[in-house]
Each structure stands twice: as C-alpha cells, then as structure tokens.
C-alpha cells in the first residue's frame, strides 16, 4: 500500500500568518501547535450538585455540643437502652401441647453502660447497688413462645424415634440365636445319663474308661503270620464270596455291578495275590 498524507481535519485552526512588520526574533521562535478554544469542549456534569454536609460522626467532637446532641462526645449514655429497673418481674404464661402450664420469669436488667465505661462516681454507685439489690448485669434470655416450645418438643420426639429406627436397622444376632454360657454348659457338660439320674447319683457315679484297642502295624512289628492263620483267613473269604478266586467283577461309578467274567488260567497266574510277609517255613 502506497503511503499518503491523511486528509485535513475540518476543525483545524491555523495560526495567523506573520505580516511583513514581524521582527526576525519572532520568526526564530518557531510555530506552536494550534489549540482548540475552550468553548468548543463538551460540558461535563459535576460530581455533585449540592454542597457536602458536615457529618457529626466523622468530625471530631465539638465543645459546643451539649446534652441536646445525640452523640454527646465520646462518653456513653448514663441510661441503659433496656427497660427501667423499676419494672419488676413480668410473668409470661402460656399453655403447652399437653395442657400443662409453663411459666418463665424475666429478671430486671442491669446497667451495662456503667460496666463498659466506668467513672469514679459510677463505680461507687454500682458498688452500693450490688450490695443492696444484687442485680444481674447481663440481660436475661428472651421468653420462649408456645409455638417454639411445641416445635422443640416435636423435634425431640422425632430425634428419639430416629435413633430407635437406626438401632433397629443395625444388623445384629437375633435374640433366639444368641448362645449364652448356661446354654453352652448344658450342651457340652450334661449327658443323657446324667439327666436320667438324680443329682446325688451324679456325684457318686464312678467314671469308667474303656481302654482303647490299638491295631498292630505289620510293617513295624517283627512278628510273622503262620501258615495256619493264612489258611483260616482264606477259608473265611471263600465263605463270604465263593467266586473270589476265578471271577472278576466290573462296577460303575455308583458301585453297581455291571459285568462278571471268569478268569482264564493265564489271568489267574497273573492276578494271583502274593504274600508280602513270608514265614520261615515258606522261606525254606
């Protein structure tokens, strides 16, 4: 883009051209930037149309301010904003939801300003009043209305019901399934014999312990079975099952007999049981 001179402003004011009578010193001073006249400027709205008022709380206390002023300098008022102490106790009576009568008493209010801003005169007066009357300095709590009391009682009942519901919802052992020490003692220590007999017979009963018979381990003992014992065992097995020597039986997984087949002489020789422990007679 080719640079060009910007268009001339319409509101531009030109300086007066120097006349022929102008001195050379005036020409050497140079030209000044033209300024617009002040009457062409847009009027500005003032920040406020009224004069500022003198705020008494923002200004320091004036010596002319007397008792008519609500501020009265930096001293505290000598009267409490609470009701006068001459007003005695007032009874607030209302009926609760259970047709009962509730009464609350409002204690007279003390002068709090003398405690916050004490003076020598006020200290003496307060000491005398405390000795005589013993007034309460702090204001008492406000009386409770019948509606607030009713709502508080309903809230307490709801909280108790909610706690009971939470206790019931918590999982626990049923009462009929709880095992006590007495029940465990009856299960483990009492036998049918003891229940049938009297308490005296239980005390005098002799305990008989039968000896436990332990079978002999043939692999750990040095004793050998004789041939007579072997033949006796063989005859007992043949009496129970005569086909035990030459018949093979097939059973399924349920233990039911599926098939029986007789063995050949070759199979008898192969499947013949062998004695693990031989006697001295067989060895020789």
Curated annotation (Swiss-Prot):
Keywords: Cytoplasm, Nucleus, Phosphoprotein. The modification Phosphothreonine is found at residues 5, 33, 173. The modification Phosphoserine is found at residues 76, 198, 201. One of its GO terms (cellular component) is cytoplasm. Phosphorylated by cyclin-dependent kinases CDC28 and PHO85 in association with G1-cyclins, promoting degradation of SIC1 and exit form G1. The keyword Membrane does not apply. This is Protein SIC1. It comes from Saccharomyces cerevisiae (strain ATCC 204508 / S288c).
């Amino acid at each position: 883009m080719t640079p060009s001179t910007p268009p001339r402003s319409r509101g531009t004011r030109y300086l007066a051209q120097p006349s022929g009578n102008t001195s050379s010193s005036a020409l050497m001073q140079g030209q000044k930037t033209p300024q617009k006249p002040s009457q062409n400027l847009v009027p500005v709205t003032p920040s406020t149309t009224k004069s500022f008022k003198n705020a008494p709380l923002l200004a320091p206390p004036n010596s002319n301010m007397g008792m008519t002023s609500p501020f009265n300098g930096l001293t505290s008022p000598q009267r409490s904003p609470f009701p006068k102490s001459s007003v005695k106790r007032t009874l607030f009576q209302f009926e609760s939801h259970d047709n009962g009568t509730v009464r609350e008493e409002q204690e007279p209010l003390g002068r709090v300003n003398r405690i916050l801003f004490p003076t020598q005169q006020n200290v003496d007066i307060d000491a005398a009043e405390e000795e005589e009357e013993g007034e309460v300095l702090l204001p008492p709590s406000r009386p409770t209305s019948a509606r607030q009391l009713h709502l508080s009682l309903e809230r307490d009942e709801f909280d108790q019901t909610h706690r009971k519901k939470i206790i019931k919802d918590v999982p626990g052992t049923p009462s009929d399934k709880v095992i006590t020490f007495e029940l465990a003692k009856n299960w483990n220590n009492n036998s049918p014999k003891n229940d049938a007999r009297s308490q005296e017979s239980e005390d005098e009963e002799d305990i008989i312990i039968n000896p436990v018979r332990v079978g002999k381990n043939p692999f750990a003992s040095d004793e050998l079975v004789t041939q007579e014992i072997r033949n006796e065992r063989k005859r007992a097995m043949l009496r129970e099952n005569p086909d035990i020597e030459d018949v093979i039986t097939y059973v399924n997984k349920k233990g039911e007999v599926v098939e029986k087949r007789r063995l050949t002489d070759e199979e008898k020789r192969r499947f013949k049981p062998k004695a693990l422990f031989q006697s001295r007679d067989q060895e020789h």
